[in-house]
Structure formats: C-alpha cells, structure tokens
C-alpha cells in the first residue's frame, strides 16, 4: 500500500472519484485525465474487499461501471441538496442564496453554536461609528434594556431608533374603545394636525368629531345629502373639507363648526380631496377630483378662511365615462399626480404661479386607482389594476419609472396557495414608509409586498390577511412600522424591517360576526390609531390605560343627528324644526342607536353640558303618534326665558295655521313626561343587523318632533366661544410652514435643473407630453417662501373612487343637473336637485344610498330578446315620514337599475336606469342641462343604423334568427379601428378568437340581441354555431359587441346573400356594380388574392377592383352585383346612379318557408299593419303611438338604447324591413322593455306597455285574426279579473322586505337551552333565516337575480342561489343537515363577490355585514347539531351495553353451540346467494292488525337486537305468494349488518321521496349513473378510509298480486330488503340471519351456481362492472310497473306502530324550491320497529357505532381508526388478543371448531381466533 493511502478515509477516496467524474463530464477534460492518472498511481480510489476480508485496488473505469447508478454530476447534486437541508435546521440570514463560499450564517459549515445571538455590553452600546451608533448585527439577540440604551444615549448623545423603541413596543397597543357612532359604513377617518381630534365620514351623510384622548363625541357636521367619499384637514388645522356623492364639497371651521363654503364645481361624485402643502403668503390651494373626469383647484386664504367659489378647472375626459379616481400632492406642494380610469397618470405643476398640466403618463394598461407621493422627494408611486405598480421620478426632462410586478416572488421562496389561484393580479393600495426607502403594495391575493424604492427589488411578502386589503397606513415617524387593514376585519401592525407581524386585532362584533375595516389612520404623534368599519363603528387604539374610555357609552349619537334639513339657494343648510344653522343649535342630548337618551353621567360629556344642573341633563321625552319615543328639548320644570317663550308661542301659532286641526290632533297625541334622574332608558341589546322594517330610533324619532329647541342669546354667546378643535401652536405652525416652504423651493429647483438636462437615451416610456396651456386660469400665485410638512396626507381610494362606473353619464346618474330619475323631484331650497337613492331590489330599499349603491356595477349583455317579467305581487313600502326634502330622498322605492354596460376592465359610458313618472307627467328639462355637463343631445341620439326603417344591404342590421357568415378578419379590423380611434374601451383579449378556435369564416345564427346606451350605441349579439348541412345548432356560441363604423366593412353577411355571391362567376376584367349609399357605383375587377396570407381560402375582400373614378379598393364578392342588360349608367364616368324602389326591393332578404308562418310575408305584413292601425286608435296605446319627444324628455336617449314605437314598427312592416316573425316579435317586446327601463316599475304606463305588448304579440301569433278589437276586449276582462284578485289579497301580510312598525325583540339564536333533538336545527335555521330576511342588508339577496335585468349573470355564475330558495328548500325538508344549508348560504355570498367586483360599493359592505352576521349565528346551530349527534351516539352505545349485560347469559349459550350456529347459518348462506338485486314483488295491503304469518303459520313477536336498541314488536301480516315462481330478496354484500327493523325504516324514509315521484304506470328503471353517485364517488376517493355501508330492509305489510317494484339504489348507504316477503330459492318464510363483518376484512367472492352472479364481499362500494351487471339484471327482471298509489301507502301501513315523527317523514311532500344535489343521509328514527319473527343479527363489529346521522367531519374522525389492528378486551376476567383480519371463510370455520384454545368470544358475542400470544396469556392464567 502506498504511503498516500495510509490514513486515507473512505469518504476522501469517494470524493476523489466524484471529483474525477465531475471534471470528466465538464469542460476540463485534460484536468480530469491528469487527476484520474494520479489517483490511480497513488491508489486513492475506493478499494474492493473480497470475501476473505482482503482489500484490492480498483481502476477508475471499474468504479464507473460499478457505480453506474451515479450521474456524472452527482457531486454537484450533492452540493445543491446541502443548502436546503441545512436551511431547515439553521436558517441563513439571506434566504434563497445558494453558495458554497459563504461565511457566518451563509456558511455551509455553520452550527447552532456559531450562529447564536450576540449580546453587546454597555460600552459597545455607547460606541460611535462614523459619528453614529453602530448597527446591530443580524444575529443580535433581544434588544438591550431601556436602561442600557438611555445610559448610552447619555454618554454619546445619539441613539438608534430600533434600540430605543424596538418594534416589540407596539405589541402594547390595544383597543381602547369601539364606539357605534354611525348608522352606515364609515369609509373615511382622519386625525387633525394635533392628533387630539378624530373625524369620521360615513354613508349616513354625517361627519363626526371625536376626542382622541377619551373618545367623547364632540360635534356632528350636517349638510351633505349623500355618502361621504373623502375628507381632508388643512395644514393649519383650521378647517375640514368633505366631499360627497352629492357632488358638493362642504368646508367647515374646525374651531366653531360653522360652515365656511359649499363648493359646487363637479357634475358627478367627488372622488378625492387634498389640501395642498404649498405656501405662498396666505394663499393656499384645495384640489378635488370627480367622477366627471374633472379636477378643480380651489384658491383660499389662510388668514380669512375665504374660499373662491370659482375654481381653476381641468376637464380630463378624452372619452365619455372617464373618471378621475385618486390624487396626491408632493411634499412641497409643487406637484400633484392624479390617476384615472383611462389608464393615464396626469402630473400638474404649481411652480409657474398657477396650476398647469406638465405630463400625461400612459404606461399602465388598466385603471390607475391608487397613487402616493413620497414623504421627502419628488418621487411618487402609482398602483393599477393591471397588476403592476410604478415608482416615478423626474429625471432628464422626463418621468422615468421602476416597474413593480405583483407576480414577482421573493428569491428562495415558493409561495403556494392563494397566489396561484388568483388569475389576474391587481394592486389595491400603495404606500411609502416614513423614510421613503421602501414601497408597500397591497395585492388582491391578500398579501402585502415590500419593495426597495430605489431598485424595485422585492424584499418581503407579508401574509396574514384573509381578504383583500385596501388600507395601508405608515407610522408617522417610525419607518419600520406599517398598519394595514382589510375586509377580513383584521388590523395588523407590521415590522417592515424584518417582514413580520408585530400585532393583529380582529374586529369581532358580538352577534354580527366581524366588521370589515374600511379605513385606518395614525395620529401625528404615533400614540393612537383609529379605524372605521362596515357597521358604523369607530375603533380607537393606543398605548396606556383605557380607563378614560370606560367612562363613555358604547353607542353615541346626538338626538339631532338625523333631523331633516332645509337648504337655501347656495345649498347652505338650516335645521328644519328650529330654522337655525346646525352649529348654532344648543348642545344636543346624547342618545343610543334607538334614540333612548343616555344617563346624566354621559350627558355631561357633551360639550356645553359639563356644568349643567342634574335636571337639565335629563331630556324630556314624548311619544309621537307612531308610538316612538322622542327627546323634547325643554323640560317641564325648566325656566324658559321670555325670548324663548315668545318665539315658542309664535312658532306654535304658525304651526297651527299651517296644519289646522291636524296639527292640534297631532299635538294632543304627544304625551309629555319627564324621565326621573335615577332611571335609565335602555335599548334592547343591539345584537344582529338592523331590520329593514325597523328604522333606527335616532333617525326616525324626530321626523315629526315639535320645533321647541331654540337657543337663547346667552346660549349663542357661550356657544360661539367654544373651541371644538384647537389650532396648532404658533411655534409648531410656523416651523411646519417653513419646512413646507423649503421643500417647495427644493422641488422647483430640482425640476428646473432636470428640465435643462439633455436626454441620455430616448426611452419608449415616460415621455413628457407637453400640453398647450389653453385653460383659463383665474388665480395667480406668488411663490414666496413656501414649505410643507408631509403630515396626514392620504392617498386611499375612497368609496366613490373605487366604485365601478364603466359607461358614460356618471354625472347625469348622480343627478344634480338632471331630474329625470325621480318620480317626485326633491326640491331643496329652491334648487332642483335630484338625489336618486334606490338600487335594484324586489322590496324596499335603503334609506340612504346613492349611485354608489348599485350592487352590480359591472355589466354584461343581454343574450336573449326581452321577455315578459314574471308577475309579482308587491306591497307599497311605507314611508318613514312625510318630510318635504330629505324624506323624498329616503323614500323606499321599487327600482331596477339599468345594468352598467361594461366589464370590469372597460371604462366606457354607463347607462344608468332612469325612472319615468307615471303617464309621462314629468317636469320638462331644458336641453341646456345636458350641455351644462359637456354633452349635447345629438351625441346620445341613436345612429341611423339603428333607427332606419328601410331595409338596406349595407350596413347590415342584425335581426333575431338571422343566419349569417361571421368573418374573423373583418371583426379584427373593427376591433383595431375602435382601439385606434379610442371610440370606446375594448379589450382585444376578450374577443372570441382568444376564447375558441375560429376559422376564417363561420356559419352562425343570431340567438340574442341587445343594444347598449353609450357613445356610441353598441349592438350586443350572441352568435350560435350552425351546422351548414343540417341547419341545426351545434351547441357552441360566443358573444360580441360592435356598431356601424365608417371605413369598416361589414363582417356579418346574411347566409342568403353569401350563397348567392359564392357561385357567381367573376373573372379578371369583369365589370360590376355595387350599392353604396343607396346608389349604384361601377367598377372593374383587376385581380383576386386573399386579404391576408394566413387565410388563403377566405372570400373576405379577396378582389382588387378599380372604380370608374380611378380609385382602387378591395371588395368582397357579396358586395358586387352583375350589371343587367337594362341597367342605367351614369351620364358622367365615375359618378353613381340612384337606386329605384324596384331595385331596392329586389335586393332585400327573401324569406324562407315558415319564417312568416303559413302565409306569405306580404299578406302577414298587411294583416299586422291593419291590426296596428286598430291598436293605435285605443287610448291605452296612445303613449306608444309615436316616438318619444326628446325635447320634452332629453334624457330618454341616455337611458334607452333602441327606441321604438308602434308607428315605427308599422312603417318597417310596410317597407318589409323584418325578415321573419321572430324579428318582429323581438321589437314588439322592446316597447315594454323600454318603458320598464325608463319608468318606475308598477306605474300605469308600465302596465299599459305590458298590456299593449301582450295584445300585439297575441295578435301576431294568431294568423287567423284580422281584428284586434275583440282580442283587446277579452284580454281587458282578464286583466280586470286578475286585478280584483290582487286587491282581495292586498291585506295578506307581505314579504319580509316590507316596512314593519312593530318592533319585535331581537333574539340571539345562541341564547337558548341546550337541545339534544337532532331535528332542532331546522327550527333554529328557520329563525335565523327570518332574522336575515328582517335585516336591511339582506335585500339584494332575498330573491333570485332577474336574468332579464342582468342577462350575463348565468355566464358568470354557474349555480345561482338566494335566500328565498334557501328558505323554500328548508321548508320542503330537503336539507339533511345544517351543513348543507350553510353551504348554500355561503354560495350566495361567493356568487355576489364573483359577479360584483367593486369592493367598496355600498352593496359590498352590506354583503360583508350579512355574511359575518350569518357566520356568527350559524356557528351555534352547527355546534348544537354536533352536540346532539354526540349525545345520541353516547346514548345509543349505553343502551347497547345495558342490553348486552341483560342478555349476556343467553348470547353466550347461543354462541357456544356449534350445532345451533349451523342451523342459523344455513338460511344466511342461502340468502346471500341471490340473482337480481332488489327485485321485490309486492301485493295488496291487508288490514294492518291481521295475524302475521310466515309460510302460512302465525308467528309470535320476536326480540331483535339492533345497533341502537332491542325492542319487542307486534307481528306483521305476511302472506305466502300463490304463484310458483320464486320471489327473490337480496341483501347487500357490503361489509354491513342488515337490520330488518330500524334500518328498513330508515331506508323507507329515504325512499319515500323517490317513491312519491313515481306517478306513471309505465315500467321504470333506476340507473346507477347519477350525479349524486358521481359526486359521492369523488368524495369517497378523497377519504382515507372507506365508509361502512349500512344494509337495511325495506318492507311491505303484504304483497300485491301481479305487481312488482324494482328499487335500485346501489350507490346509497342502505340497500333494500322486504322481510315480509322473503323467499330463498323458491321456498318462503325463513328469514335470513345476516352476519356483519368487522373492519379490515379481505374481500371474499361467492359464486351463485344457479344464476352465475358474482358477489364481491368487501366494504365500501361495489365495483363498477358489478354495478353494471346488476343494473342490467335489474332491468331484465323489472316486469311490473310501480304504482305510485300503492308504494307510499304500503309503506305507511307497515309503519303503523311508529311514532308521528316517522309518519311525517314518510308522508313528506315532494321537494320544493330548488333541489340541490346532495348525498343521501340516514335519518334518525329511534323508536319501535316492526320486523318478522326469528330474525336475529349475528354481529361481527367490535366498534361502537350508531345509526344516527353523523356529521361528515365527525365521521371522518371516527373512521380514522378503522384499519385492521390488534384489539384487547378486558372485562375483569381474562385478556385475549385477537386479530380482525381473518377472512369470512375462516370465520365460518371457527364456528365448527371444538378446540377451546383456538377461538374465543368477544364481549359482543363474536367469535375471535386467538393469537399465540393470547393463548400464552390464557395458559398463564
């Protein structure tokens, strides 16, 4: 052995070999050869050891052959594996980095000891490095103590924030208080600049001011008439501005709450508000963006707080429907960036003295809905729905961006789960940390991603939310901390440096589930943060004690919060009852949500009532005529000043004059009384959502309150001196202003310098688009010393900014300048202001919603012609009050919103649903109101392509039933042209050729048409594929939208026209003529070639032609006509010849046979024209005779896309416009459709339209009818009779959507005694559904979605579900467990979220609240149900044990006799060998009390042991069949026990539903192949343990002659047997004794020699081949029909001794409502059972089982232990070990063995083969 070999380990020699293999396989071949030679010489390779132990050297080639299982790169693979393996044990500091050369925690040699935490001593903490404390190492342990940190700071005067304030400190932030202060969702919250005040803005139109330190409600700012969409506090902390969906901006003084201005510059909702940080003397700016696509800059003075009402306005609407969504100012206020729905970012600059637009950045591919400037520089980040964010910075005269792709994943991490399920990533929110080092983006996959703001590198992915996140709030001074909140109710504090969660809070609301968090803000000092939620709560978090917050009430409202207001001409408001400005009214009383005043200790918390006497703190209560309590301001014992008494007397006299006797009677009904100081008026616990019939007391109690709240002069003086929000101290304000000024100057300097620098490269992106400065700027700004502090600036998307409004006329829908929607115009202070507050519902709607409550903001297309709306009996909703202004806006109305006609990505125009008042008696609007909004009436008029009454070949006008050829090339050209000209937003990826394989031309049939309102009006078609040979539909289809556009050739060609042209012979040089604009044009064919090479066979534009005027063009053969001999040519070459009427008629469509019924088209057209003439003479049709007068109703064309009327239809009939009956009927239906769209449902004009439409359709269908008057009379009589019936039913209680005055107590479903009734869940679920129906939030989900209103609903939603269907299914008894009901209810919410993507619309918050409410209550129902199951299971087991103990001696003796076992086993063996499964002959039922007979002999009652109990039962009447043929009964061969009593009843209950449906006398065959079976099969595949099948017996009292029933349900748990008619191989009477095998049995196959049937004896389901064989056999033996009038009755007769519950179950009516596909389950039937005599069950199962239905989850747990394994039995005697895996044959053999030590008997009487160990134990005993 060589010297080198000595001491060489085996590992080293293997390493040499692997290195040589690695080098040999790589580029270093020569080095490999050298190494191989050297290791061979020195014998360094692994050696071989022979059988004697001697070692022998081996060559390299020998080793390669020996280790041929090793790849050449085996060494490299080992290195790859080392890193991940070590990572699991000792994580490295930088995850994902794979290196062999790392050090420290990156080293592959690292150990736990080498990576332990480092702890510095005090001297190290006090050291300085480069003038600052050194940074802690990565493996630094716990942060140093606060004492060491403070001492080091004392030594060196410096500190690091992470040491002084570690992020663990934020774990001590807790929720101080959750206050209910609003009646609706609160989308806006902000702090003032001091952090001592909190402002909340809600959907209930109120802005409230709260004290941060103790949570007191300080003031309510009233005035808005719609939802608050955004708020902003100025930097001087002197005023607050709030924008609303009512298109107004209201500004209040923070010191006195006095209104400073009402700004009206937008024609649609306000989407964002920002106070500019810019400082120029006393001049300041306020910016606002709106859904009308405009941005306004309002100039105001910081000294006087005066705001110029005329803004500098930019209209950024390149096409209708574009909205400005978000905005953000730079730190110095010199830049403003905005995002909008047209994908463009616009940047405005203030450095030239006035705002000017300097850039338009169009690099996002979807809407930009979040934007935020950095805190210290001129960088900003934008987030888009295209799944990307961009960080922008102005460099070298252009805006450059860093792309942040949300699909990026961190290195070394493979995030699975939800991220993979999200098909399209979307950015929902963006934010910067305080130091601008990182950018945080919220993604729709419920994660937050942290990026390096300078490189765009992904740093962390923060996971913890369970729903989408729309709130990101950085800490005001700590760059490590970020707050996030989402719709899942979680508020999470993150450590951005480590990427971990510091603390999380869950907003659980008792009785209502969780509340989705909609906004969150942190106070400027970082001590508090506040959140608001979907239920109207304000949540205050902070450090320290909550003792101050414990002194306030949980519900805080002022009694005057919801009083009606009146508006003057400038939209300033006064309280209607006191005629005072709200801020001048005396201090209000504090009440709860139901209007009950709080005790006096709480009243002192109201500003102005701190020093009041006790009696002055108790409000005087009165009762209104409606029975509601109300607060009266003056107390009976209070001294009233002379001024007060005089004003009060004058007001009372005025009231009497106005109301007359009514006022006296109303006043007399008010019982005034004083509440004692010791008593407290409490509301019922506010658990659960508010009911729709139960208006909150705080809102309704003052609707008719007397005007008694008048302030005295001393009150006004004292009140005017109050300070609600303190101003900033002079030093702080001046310092912040200096900072903002400096930042502004820095931004100007940076911008100017970058503007002068030249481009380094001409990039494709980020080009500066300089716009012409053609805007009229009214205000100029002197840029002096200006500076800003970036504090409290937000970029969150408000609810209005997030709402989807894709098609135009948002400003008209919101409605200030148009009043066409409301039946009653809301007149406010002399101005015509319409505030539509209704949304699609079958019943009453919310009291306070606007256009943002449209719960289906995204739209689709109607794929079918309009059909009749189902007739519903509706009740008129009760109005809560008779107010003149606000109440009109809050009236409950039945309104159907017109679908907004675009998909989520589409930003085209909307078509809001307008209401037309009854009989068209509506206030006329001047056309000028349209022009005020930048629109003209002509823009909205439908094109001539739609309104033309003459048939033309070009352009093609689609009609129902048209068979057309679709040309993909033409459609692609249309899409490209529409995109190029930006006519409307169109997504090329959603075109049909991206969804399916399309040839160049396809034969299609038009099966659906709908027109969409917009600019332009679009035609939406559904095209179905047509087989050209058979003319039948093939089943496929697609949808498309298009309109007639100049310079775009028709790509839909009638089949008739195509076929005529296809066979027309054209040659080069042939002359032709073509119809263009109703004239003949002549030309010559020059050549033929395909338009595109990839479609060589396409005829689309395949000819190159030359017109006579010299122009060349491509033409399609169907556009060219042969020139006849008698053709008229133009006088001048190159001109045209007009078409004659004869030529026009010859070119139109020639109808096919049957398209006009049995008569020719001309005859039918004349008949229908005559009928229409008669119809037009009737008064009921007068409104539909002529087109709608657009001068009188200018908004009509903005609502109705396809206007039509009787005269238009008549004219088209005369011109032979319609190509078939279905085309005509489609247009007739549109009369009703348009009327219903424009008018209020249920109004007389809608009823008239329905009647006229039905009448005309009946007339058209009846081709023998030539006089419409008799038909009119008969239909009129029928309608009158129907209306009388409806009037009779008018007093019937309405649906739950109706307003109810009675206040039923709200119950908690969980506060009830524990019930162990398994069926109790049905009643509990019924109560829960009743509560849900009474909740206001359930209105959109109560009834099925109207497919006429939302035709694309089924395209998106596969399985519709609603609460009415759930209730019907529950009442019909079709839910077998509460889990199934829970699944359907959850389906309702998942369907809604899938169909309505707008996450911050009001309807979305309703769904969140209702879903959380349901989950909160259903949890207790599920818990009780599972508890009942467990109780019954334990009860059943205890019964078994008692029975077993009572019969132990009898069972032991019976089991010990082998001869007895043989006798028992014989019928069992016979019964198991059978032919046709479930072939059950039945006979007529004899009286149930006759003597039971088996084989003609009376039998006594028998004792039967079942798994639940053992009962003695009465005899059953049976009769031996008279026929000689064998009647066969079959027992399932599954691993079950047959229970002829109870199991039969269970199965009969289950089959009663199926039997009730068998009404036909024809033979029926039951098939195995059902959807239930397949679903069950899938379920069983997923379970690790097969379920044990239950075998039961289905019995009849006695057989019927000459009838048989074949009942096959092979896939269910129970199989069917009739014990009363058991006959085995032709011999009757002896019932079978069934053996139930234990778990783990091997399958045993028995062959029936008589029938050849193979029965697989194994657990679980039968094999498919056996099922098929049994199915065929069953069908062959099915010779007699099943009589529905026999089976159920016989079943009931057999169950004569059962209790009423079982009879109810058996006689249950058939399923009602929607029938969900569910797995059959066994019902719990625990009572006496009727069985034949001598039926005994030999039990083999040693497991504790129950017949009760077990919850699937519990059953899964129970089945986990069902695998074969060793079991023991210890009854205080001996212990025997036995196996359960012996076969069935072995089991039978044990019955006949006589050796005492080869088998034993278990506690249940089962024979068990003893193991050797068991024998040894027995011998040892």
Curated annotation (Swiss-Prot):
Compositional bias of kind Basic residues: 912-924, 1297-1310, 1435-1446
Induction: In motor neurons after injury.
Sites of N6-acetyllysine modification: 1497, 1533
Region (Mediates interaction with IRS1): 924-1129
CDD domains listed in its UniProt record: Bromo_WDR9_I_like (cd05529), Bromo_WDR9_II (cd05496), WD40 (cd00200)
Tissue occurrence: Widely expressed with most abundant expression detected in pancreatic islets, brain and skeletal muscle. Predominantly expressed in developing and regenerating neurons. Expressed in adult brain (granular layer of the olfactorium bulb, hippocampus, dentate gyrus and cerebellum internal granular layer). Expressed in the CA3 region of adult hippocampus, adult and fetal retina, perinatal dorsal root ganglion and embryonal olfactory epithelia (at protein level).
Residue ranges of every copy of the Bromo domain listed in the record: 1156-1263, 1316-1421
Placement of covalent cross-link Glycyl lysine isopeptide (Lys-Gly) (interchain with G-Cter in SUMO2): 421, 1470, 1644, 1670
PTM sites of type Phosphoserine: 136, 641, 659, 674, 677, 683, 692, 879-881, 911, 1281, 1283, 1296, 1315, 1405, 1479, 1525, 1560, 1651, 1762, 1783
Complex formation: Interacts (via bromo domain) with acetylated lysine residues on histone H1.4, histone H3 and H4 (in vitro). Interacts with IRS1 and IRS2.
Identification of the protein by name: PH-interacting protein
Annotated source species: Mus musculus
